[in-house]
């Protein structure tokens, strides 16, 4: 059995998957915020419960935000302070007496989608989360992590020149939480979608409200969505020219907006090299379970 943990600032979620990659059981507990020993206990108790329930010693994979293992073997995860700065992988491997594998949660999202029954035919899969700006790359069923675990942090690329041509050269470059100016996640995420609407129309609406107006045929919302899709295509043009994936899977809250997957493909070719083919574009299939799935499938990559 394959055990996949999706760990964040508020919850530790465990999903147990069988050899056919089907979810058999799941359980969630709150994430301890201050005590590292309590954090380790929470994970180990869930593993023990799964072992007893299924009568096996399952493999353990963990998806967590941040850098799973720094040069000195410790975790860097600002959203999980109880474990950040600690040798999480080594400690859990010792306590559980098995090979524990860690990866970035966005990489786990991409891995989950790449191992979907419909998508395993594609050698190079790119996952993009239109919410956090994160993403990941999976080649032949294995995540590409890079030495710093930042492969796929597409949201921290800066606005390209073509974006400024589209939006205007006086378009404000917003400061990102990472400290840089003009990171594309500040414009393409759900909050960015709402910020763009407020910037152009001086109205403060949330993304679902804007989408509802679009669905009702509102002209202003229609113009906003057209501009947003053009901006998304411009930014993806740069990324796809570098990565050239077979499949692009889009997740996050905005992925539920069908216009993104249905209308994006027709906009992409003008921003790619003439010989390039746009990838197949699909909405993420596995929703909230994606993090657990991808973490569990870290043991399918041998």
Swiss-Prot record:
ATP binds at residues 4-11, 133-139. This is N-acetyl-D-glucosamine kinase. The keyword Transport does not apply. The keyword Nucleotide-binding applies. Pathway: Cell wall biogenesis; peptidoglycan recycling. Belongs to the ROK (NagC/XylR) family. NagK subfamily. Pfam families: ROK. It comes from the Bacteria. Gene3D superfamilies: 3.30.420.40. The gene is nagK. It catalyses: N-acetyl-D-glucosamine + ATP = N-acetyl-D-glucosamine 6-phosphate + ADP + H(+). CDD domains: ASKHA_NBD_ROK_NAGK. Keywords: ATP-binding, Carbohydrate metabolism, Kinase, Metal-binding, Nucleotide-binding, Transferase, Zinc. Its EC number is 2.7.1.59. Zn(2+) binds at residues 156, 176, 178, 183. Catalyzes the phosphorylation of N-acetyl-D-glucosamine (GlcNAc) derived from cell-wall degradation, yielding GlcNAc-6-P.
């Amino acid at each position: 059995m394959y055990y996949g943990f999706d760990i964040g600032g508020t919850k530790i979620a465990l999903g147990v998957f069988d050899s056919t990659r089907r979810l058999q059981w799941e359980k969630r507990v709150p994430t301890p915020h201050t005590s590292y020993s309590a954090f380790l206990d929470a994970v180990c108790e869930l593993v023990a419960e799964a072992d007893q329930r299924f009568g096996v010693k399952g493999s353990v994979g963990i998806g967590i935000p941040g850098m799973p293992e720094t040069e000195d073997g410790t975790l860097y995860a600002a959203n999980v302070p109880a474990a950040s700065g600690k040798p999480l992988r080594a400690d859990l491997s010792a306590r559980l007496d098995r090979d524990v594998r860690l990866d970035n949660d966005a990489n786990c999202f991409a891995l989950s989608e790449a191992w979907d029954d419909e998508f395993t035919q594609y050698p190079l899969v790119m996952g993009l989360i239109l919410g956090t700006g994160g993403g990941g790359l999976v080649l032949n069923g294995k995540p590409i992590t890079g030495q710093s675990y930042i492969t796929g942090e597409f949201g921290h690329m800066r606005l390209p020149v073509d974006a400024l041509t589209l939006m205007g050269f006086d378009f404000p470059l917003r400061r990102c939480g990472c400290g840089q100016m003009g990171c594309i996640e500040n414009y393409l995420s759900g909050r960015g979608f709402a910020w763009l609407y407020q910037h152009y129309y001086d109205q403060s609406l949330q993304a679902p409200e804007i989408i509802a107006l679009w669905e009702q045929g509102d002209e202003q919302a229609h113009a906003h969505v057209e501009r947003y899709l053009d901006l998304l295509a411009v930014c993806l043009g740069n990324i796809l020219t570098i990565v050239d994936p077979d499949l692009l899977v889009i997740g996050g809250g905005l992925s539920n907006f069908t216009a993104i997957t249905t209308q994006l493909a027709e906009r992409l070719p003008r921003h790619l090299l003439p010989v390039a083919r746009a990838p197949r574009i699909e909405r993420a299939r596995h929703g909230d379970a994606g993090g657990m799935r991808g973490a569990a499938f870290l043991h399918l990559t041998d």
